[in-house]
């Protein structure tokens, strides 16, 4: 063997022994940028390290080092608060569906609805049919047709009042505001001492019974078949 080849072989053997003597690292050494010099003031302080946190992350930096078990309780509380807020924000339709209708008592006639009421008819304000006509809030006595229209002018559609008839002292008039204007319907007294509304209504014992009946039913009057007596116009007392 030539001297050059023997020297090369000895160098390779020596290098392999040194490599085997050095233990391999378990983890890779993370990259750390070298200091690029002193600060602009020349005080020898290193440049501040750049933050590697995401720009849109609002969490404090120390949360990145917390294990999942530490943050799990905080996340659970956040979900619980959000769930409670959504339960408190119920929509009107959902809240109305959840309400139970009030139980009717035998001693409270105002809580009972009239039998035979049309389901599609809107409900007007309740009228006590046993109360005398003079004590009803919607009875205005001897006022003219013009005065009745002036009272109804600022009211909503289906507002009404009852007044004395200007042509017959034994009859009354029902003044009603419709979408087309004002309507004046006669409440006539029959020979049997009953009262009828117009020409197509059944007889009633009193005018308050008529108002109570048509507060939940359609009026039998041409041009007002779609309407009910919904909003009484109360008399003004001084």
Swiss-Prot record:
Residues 1-70, 85-121 are annotated as: Disordered. The modification Phosphoserine is found at residue 39. May become phosphorylated upon binding to PDGFRA. Residues 138-233 form the SH2 domain. Keywords: Apoptosis, Phosphoprotein, SH2 domain. Pfam families: SH2. Residues 55-66 have a biased composition (Acidic residues). The keyword Phosphoprotein applies. It comes from the Eukaryota. The keyword DNA-binding does not apply. The modification Phosphotyrosine is found at residue 64. Gene3D superfamilies: SH2 domain. Adapter protein which may play a role in the regulation of apoptosis in response to PDGF. Interacts with phosphorylated 'Tyr-720' of PDGFRA via its SH2 domain. This is SH2 domain-containing adapter protein F. It comes from Mus musculus (Mouse). The lineage of its organism: Eukaryota, Metazoa, Chordata, Craniata, Vertebrata.
